[in-house]
């Protein structure tokens, strides 16, 4: 590594072709003492160069850029550096587009309409090896997944198979944890869940942690998908 960086902090590289957006993201990340933005660039070529130079923990990657776009750059980086964590930043919330991007090996997908809390939370989750999907995107993915499940059930019924009977909600979750899980499915962020249930964001995080532990999953996206698959929550 050619540059001096603070190894006790989460080192971040920002790649986006709009300088004003990069500067705005820098200001948000600067509010978090655990973060250090070590470099930024304007296209996919810069991304490869900066990763080689700084060996960051997390790369914030735009998609629509000149020269080498974010999808190509992410695929190239993951192939060269399998341990690198790429958090994609995009304006697109279409589930087919998101799925295409995630197939490159990206660790997360965040819409550019995100607030500061969501950005900070996403970087922390991805840096720790988890996956983070923007709540709005998660909701769209879940609706598409649910549609496909319903189609499969209908096809099975038509050829004489019994419809799969969903298991009852998890008895190991408390009432409050079930409420939090439902709101997670609805696409709520931790802050929004806290406002809806009149509890602090810290309490919400504790509930989410307990849910993940009890369900034996790594992140909230897995928890939501598993819950829908088993009929523990409603897709609204």
Swiss-Prot record:
DNA-binding region per Swiss-Prot/TrEMBL record: 190-209
Keywords: Activator, Cytoplasm, DNA-binding, Phosphoprotein, Repressor, Transcription, Transcription regulation, Two-component regulatory system
Keyword Cytoplasm attached: yes
Residue ranges constituting the Response regulatory domain according to the UniProt record: 11-127
Residue ranges annotated for the HTH luxR-type domain, each copy included: 166-231
A GO MF term: DNA binding
Main location class: cytoplasm
Entry PTM: Phosphorylated and dephosphorylated by DegS.
Organism superkingdom: Bacteria
Residues passing through the membrane, by range: none
Function: Member of the two-component regulatory system DegS/DegU, which plays an important role in the transition growth phase.
Alphabetized PANTHER family for the sequence: TRANSCRIPTIONAL REGULATORY PROTEIN DEGU (PTHR43214:SF39), TWO-COMPONENT RESPONSE REGULATOR (PTHR43214)
Protein name: Transcriptional regulatory protein DegU
Organism: Brevibacillus brevis (Bacillus brevis)
């Amino acid at each position: 590594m050619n540059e001096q960086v603070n190894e006790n902090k989460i080192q971040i590289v920002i790649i986006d072709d709009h300088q004003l957006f990069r500067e705005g993201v820098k200001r948000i990340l600067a509010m978090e003492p655990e973060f250090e933005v070590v470099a930024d660039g304007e296209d996919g070529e810069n991304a490869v160069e900066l990763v080689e130079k700084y060996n960051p923990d997390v790369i914030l990657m735009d998609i629509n850029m000149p020269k080498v776009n974010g999808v190509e750059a992410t695929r190239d980086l993951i192939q060269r550096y399998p341990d690198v964590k790429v958090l994609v930043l995009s304006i697109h919330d279409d589930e087919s587009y998101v799925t295409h991007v995630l197939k490159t090996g990206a660790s997360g997908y965040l819409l550019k309409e995100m607030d500061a809390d969501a950005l900070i939370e996403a970087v922390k989750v991805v840096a720790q090896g988890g996956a983070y999907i923007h709540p709005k995107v998660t909701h769209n993915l879940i609706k598409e997944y649910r549609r496909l499940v319903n189609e499969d059930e209908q096809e099975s019924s038509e050829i004489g198979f019994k419809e799969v009977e969903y298991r009852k909600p998890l008895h190991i979750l408390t009432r409050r944890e079930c409420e939090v899980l439902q709101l997670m499915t609805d696409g709520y962020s931790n802050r929004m869940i806290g406002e809806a249930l009149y509890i602090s964001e810290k309490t919400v995080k504790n509930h989410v942690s307990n849910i993940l532990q009890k369900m034996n999953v790594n992140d909230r996206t897995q928890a939501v998908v598993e819950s829908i698959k088993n009929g523990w929550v409603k897709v609204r």
